[in-house]
Each structure stands twice: as structure tokens, then as C-alpha cells.
């Protein structure tokens, strides 16, 4: 079919649309479309927090306040108390901010015509660096820089195996930085490519009917309804995936913080 012959070119064009293009300046020193929507997401988050603070009462009222309080309490109970443990209070502001920031960026990216701030590897790398520096800082603060470095090798391992284990653990620690960034980026990128592909299929199959209404074209356009139904299903799944990715990123950060502080307590 002619439609399927055009599909590879359409998919290639779709993928090229996800590349970073400058909105202001150039790629080396400017604002790309992902940076722009990252800024927009930050503004939206600040507005949401301001509205929530203004409407917050002793007894929550309204869908917005109740919904937002549920999200905050979920992060507090499941990630803060559940993962970090007794020291959760001092880490809660960072973890909650991280979760909400990633969540807002992921959700905005699902609105047609907008881009997710987390759709560029540079953005996810920056978030990963923040998380990495955060748990390293608290690890060093808990029992000193030298103590934290030495703690990477478990106690009870004799020389020279302890040196080998220390090198492996050091590599594993820095690998966290890469996995945090790549996991979030790849999941968001892949999801948008899949949605775009199904949208292309639906529009290409529907196009003959839109150009000339006839019974033959109507029958030929029926498969587009199936593609459209699948697209709607994938869109709903992407909403869930966007929330899950924000959760996974925040949970892993909490785990790394907890591990750093647990080592200090054991010493």
C-alpha cells in the first residue's frame, strides 16, 4: 500500500522533530525548545504551589487541594518514611520538589504542541547531577569525606580483595549518575515516539476520507479508527508512565541517600 511506503519517511521526520532546536540563540549558547518548556514547567509548578498554599485549610476542600495533598502525603509516606526512614523530614523538601518537578514536566509534554522538559538528555542529566551531588553531600556530611570514600568498601574484606571491591563500588556509585539520566530520558523519548507513530498511522489512513467522501474511502478509513483507539490507550498509558518515571527517579534518589546515611550509622 502507498500509505505504508510513506510510513518510514514519516517516522524519520517524527524522530527528527525530537532533536533539540534553538528557540533563542544557537545550540552552543541559547534556549532550545526543551529548555523553553522546562522553564514553562517551572513557572507552572510555582503557580500550582502558590495556589495550593493560598487555598490550603485545616480541612482540605475541593478537588485541587485534596488531590495535591494526596500527592504530597504519598511522597511523604511512601518515599520519605518508607525509603529514607527516621531522617525523612530533612530530605522531604528535596525529594518532594524533585518528584513534582519531573511529574509536571512529563505531564506538560503530553499536551499536543508542547515538549517535555525531560525529553532532552541534557535536562535529565542535570536532574541526575542534582540527585548525585545531594546524596554524596549527605554521605560526606554524615561521616566525613575520607570516611565516606572508605565506606564504599565493605568491612571484613581482606587486602587485596577490598581494593577490588572498592573500585567496583566506586564505579557503581558513578554509574548511578548515568542510569538516572538515561532511564528517564529513554522512557520519555520512546513513549512519545510510539504515540507519534500511531498518530501518523491514524491520520494517513483517515486522509483519503477527508479528501473525498465516498463509501469506498469510508471503508478504507475504518482501520484508522483502530489506530486511533490504540493511540488513545497509549496516551492513557503514557500518563501513567510519566507519573511512574517521576516516582522511580525520586525513589532511587531516596534509596541512595538512605544507603549513604545507613553506612554512617553502622560505623
Language-model segments: what does each one mean?
Residues 1-267:
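Selective transmembrane helix interface/packing segments
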Amino acid at each position: 500500500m502507498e500509505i505504508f511506503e510513506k510510513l518510514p519517511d514519516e517516522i524519520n521526520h517524527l524522530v527528527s522533530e525530537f532533536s533539540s532546536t534553538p528557540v533563542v540563540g544557537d545550540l552552543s549558547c541559547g534556549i532550545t525548545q526543551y529548555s523553553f518548556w522546562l522553564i514553562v514547567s517551572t513557572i507552572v509548578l510555582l503557580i500550582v504551589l502558590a495556589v495550593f498554599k493560598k487555598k490550603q485549610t485545616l480541612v482540605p476542600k475541593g478537588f485541587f487541594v485534596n488531590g495535591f495533598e494526596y500527592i504530597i502525603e504519598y511522597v511523604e509516606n511512601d518515599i520519605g518514611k518508607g525509603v529514607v526512614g527516621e531522617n525523612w523530614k530533612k530530605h522531604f523538601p528535596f525529594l518532594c520538589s524533585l518528584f513534582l518537578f519531573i511529574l509536571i514536566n512529563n505531564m506538560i509534554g503530553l499536551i499536543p504542541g508542547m515538549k517535555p522538559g525531560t525529553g532532552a538528555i541534557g535536562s535529565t542529566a542535570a536532574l541526575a547531577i542534582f540527585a548525585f551531588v545531594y546524596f554524596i553531600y549527605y554521605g560526606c556530611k554524615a561521616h566525613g569525606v575520607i570516611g565516606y570514600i572508605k565506606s564504599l568498601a565493605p568491612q571484613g574484606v581482606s587486602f587485596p580483595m577490598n581494593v577490588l571491591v572498592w573500585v567496583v563500588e566506586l564505579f557503581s556509585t558513578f554509574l548511578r549518575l548515568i542510569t538516572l539520566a538515561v532511564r528517564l530520558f529513554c522512557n520519555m523519548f520512546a513513549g512519545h515516539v510510539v504515540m507519534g507513530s500511531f498518530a501518523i498511522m491514524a491520520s494517513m489512513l483517515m486522509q483519503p476520507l477527508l479528501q473525498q467522501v465516498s463509501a469506498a474511502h469510508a471503508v478504507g478509513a475504518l482501520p484508522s479508527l483502530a489506530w486511533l483507539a490504540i493511540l488513545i490507550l497509549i496516551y492513557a498509558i503514557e500518563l501513567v508512565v510519566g507519573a511512574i518515571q517521576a516516582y522511580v527517579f525520586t525513589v532511587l534518589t531516596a534509596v541512595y541517600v538512605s544507603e549513604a546515611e545507613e553506612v554512617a550509622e553502622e560505623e
